[in-house]
């Protein structure tokens, strides 16, 4: 992935920080400018994710540092492609109605669609078994930020939404 970033003139910057801003944990981010495009990789955050995940799985399923880096580079590279082509996933999809009163209707795009597409892109490009956000969910469960019960409830809720 680093080679692909270099070929597309995307600078990859490794930052020895946790990537935590207020209550949001960043693992990587891409910044666009006319001068240069930069993907920042928050090494401490990725190492923490990798170590926490690796405690939970069998030896054959453990993540390497290179795999964790490539997962996050692929994810951010998808956002680069959206930006470069000016085709943002949330704009391609039909907007949803967020409010309606009589004939007044307010619609919006769903920004989360771009994140989901980036996860799917990453999974396909790297040949992963699962969408890569599973690593974040394992991390959140293992660190106690969400309970396994709450996670299972989320999955049940998602299934109901997909069926309806």
Kindly label every feature range from the protein language model:
Residues 1-25:
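Basic, amphipathic N-terminal segments that precede the first structured/catalytic domain
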């Amino acid at each position: 992935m680093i080679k692909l970033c270099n070929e597309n003139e995307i600078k990859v910057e490794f930052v020895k920080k946790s990537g935590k801003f207020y209550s949001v944990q960043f693992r990587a981010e891409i910044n666009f400018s006319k001068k240069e495009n930069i993907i920042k990789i928050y090494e401490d955050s990725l190492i923490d994710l990798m170590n926490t995940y690796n405690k939970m799985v069998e030896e054959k399923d453990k993540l390497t540092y290179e795999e964790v880096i490539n997962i996050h580079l692929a994810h951010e590279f998808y956002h680069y492609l959206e930006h470069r082509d000016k085709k943002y996933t949330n704009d391609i999809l039909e907007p949803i109605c967020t409010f309606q009163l009589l004939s007044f209707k307010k619609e919006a795009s769903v920004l989360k669609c771009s994140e989901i597409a980036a996860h799917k892109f990453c999974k396909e490009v790297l040949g992963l078994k699962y969408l890569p956000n599973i690593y974040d969910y394992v991390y959140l469960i293992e660190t106690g930020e969400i309970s396994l019960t709450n996670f299972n409830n989320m999955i049940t809720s998602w299934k109901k939404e997909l069926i309806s």
